[in-house]
Amino acid sequence: MGKIIGIDLGTTNSCVSVLEGDKAKVIENAEGDRTTPSIVAFTDDNEILVGQSAKRQAVTNPRNTLFAVKRLIGRKFTDDVVQKDIKMVPYSIVGADNGDAWVEVKGDKKAPPQISAEVLKKMKKTAEDYLGEKVTEAVITVPAYFNDSQRQATKDAGKIAGLEVKRIINEPTAAALAYGMDKAKGDRTIAVYDLGGGTFDISVIEIADVDGEHQFEVLSTNGDTFLGGEDFDLRLIEYLAEEFKKSNGIDLHNDPLALQRLKEAAEKAKIELSSSQQTEVNLPYITADATGPKHLVVKLTRAKLESLVEELVNRSLEPVKMAIKDADLSVSEIDDVILVGGQTRMPLVQQKVAEFFGKEPRKDVNPDEAVAMGAAIQGAVLSGDVKDVLLLDVTPLTLGIETMGGVATPLIEKNTTIPTKKSQVFSTAEDNQTAVTIHVVQGERKQAAQNKSLGRFDLADIPPAPRGMPQVEVTFDIDANGILNVSAKDKATGKEQSIVIKASSGLSDDEIENMVKDAEANAEADRKFEELVSARNTLEGLVHATKKTLEEAGDKATAEEKSAIEAAITEAEEALKSGDKDAIEAATKKVTDASGSLAQKLYAEQSAQQQGSAGATGGEQPKADKAADDGVVDAEFEEVKDDK
């Protein structure tokens, strides 16, 4: 059985890890980095770039470079947070036929799980390159405060990427696993403060020793799925754009290219101000008007940045208060505070968290890697490689159904340990009612309409009876991924109806299947592209070596040989321009055949010379042969370079 890898699918960056022995190892990608930007770009020649290569070309291709797509996953186009994002990103966010928020690239609508799947494919390939074997199973992390549709959409992304998602695990819980596995025995309560690129989570977790087993029990969780480093960047972008408008009268929001440059500069300045007190944002030729080019130069202090984002940091403390209250603890009962997510490197965040908890947060957890490492540990627990760990997670939001008067009646309260199952009996609202609609909602509001609608289904053929008489038993069953199954049963007839909640919209099985096929087709195109590059490199190396041999052979080559070789080289150069793999391979054969007799002649001559000087110092290797050797090495080097 292959390894189950752990993937932290982040808003800004992603990370992949695997358990080696009893330690989780973060795997470096092809570029040598331990994290990969969660950025996907579509180029003019229909190539899909993922990670650093996509990030590098974002400034010149802003409309087709997609970042922070995790913020859209499992969301409706009409959601306020989505509408706010539309104004802030250079790419196009559109409404899908089912009402979900999708993105549009080159006139083609794509679902967020499709884009996330490209990042997951890169993570899968990174793990496969390292392990030297196929990887088909993964544990993928999500923000603890993700609702059911967002979890389902993340599973869909895994499926599109060719992965069987063995478990969806909450990010703070994963970080606690990574932290708690190598700590001394004994019971303690920790708070995981997870401020990532796009989401914020807080979980209160009790780590206990139960009969030699590490037990991780989540006591409570809370958060905000639209608060993260991207929002800190946006505050800074707004400030820089406003300063530029004041001095130049030009609004940079209308220029996607300028907006993309601003985003990069804001992110860089924010990171620099974590270690220095002042920095300068300098963007020459940011735009132009009738009077000529305009440059943006703004001095920025740490104090200014902190004043711009202090409200965001304070906003994160509200869910923290709720989580501690829900865990039925006081702040002083928290033994350790763990910081996770790149945004927690900001001194202001560390200061506010330390002030709130009355203790310094731990510094021995890598905020970018802990989540992926925890996912890898959970993968090893599921595969049986790790046996002394028990993980008890919770559902983050209350689940219930809509009852008479539009009230949300809870069946499973938030922070209930999962997996769990709960049943409740309801009845009809009118006389002789023969069908009931079960409307499933998720959230903390008393009014059903103000909560997230997860889906609805009908239980029909109820025998007519006075209102309040029929007994309809509704059962909620949450699995270990936090994904819900709902069934309704008429107790009189035994008739039952059930659904797996896939959100009130989401992707259908057919859509997912088509996206899987599409992803496989892309993989085939990638393979063909690699074969073409390999063939091209081989021919280029051969042409170079043959030219060199011909030049150094001088008058040892007959006019006929020279003419045949030059004709083959001309044809080869044309084939290289064409980009046709078959033509390139045919040209490679022609060059090899045309230069074969000359190569044999030179080799025979060299052998004769070596025999003539036998017993001497061995003589110098003839130049022509040396050149031919050089050529072979050149060609091999090119191929290796391509396969890197």
From Swiss-Prot:
For the modification Phosphothreonine, which residues carry it?
199
Q: Where is the composition biased (Acidic residues)?
A: 631-644
Q: Which Gene3D superfamilies match?
A: 1.20.1270.10, 3.30.420.40, Actin, Chain A, domain 4, Substrate Binding Domain Of DNAk, Chain A, domain 1
- UniProt entry tagged with the keyword Ion transport: no
Q: Which PROSITE patterns match?
A: HSP70_1 (PS00297), HSP70_2 (PS00329), HSP70_3 (PS01036)
Task: Return the Low complexity bias intervals.
Answer: 604-614
What upregulates it?
A: By stress conditions e.g. heat shock.
**Which stretches of sequence are listed as region Disordered?**
602-644
The answer to whether the entry has keyword Repeat is no
- Cite the entry's keywords alphabetically: ATP-binding, Chaperone, Nucleotide-binding, Phosphoprotein, Stress response
Q: What GO annotations for molecular function exist for this entry?
A: ATP binding; ATP-dependent protein folding chaperone; unfolded protein binding
- What does this protein's UniProt record list under function? Acts as a chaperone.
- Protein name as annotated: Chaperone protein DnaK
List the taxonomic lineage: Bacteria, Pseudomonadati, Pseudomonadota, Gammaproteobacteria, Cellvibrionales
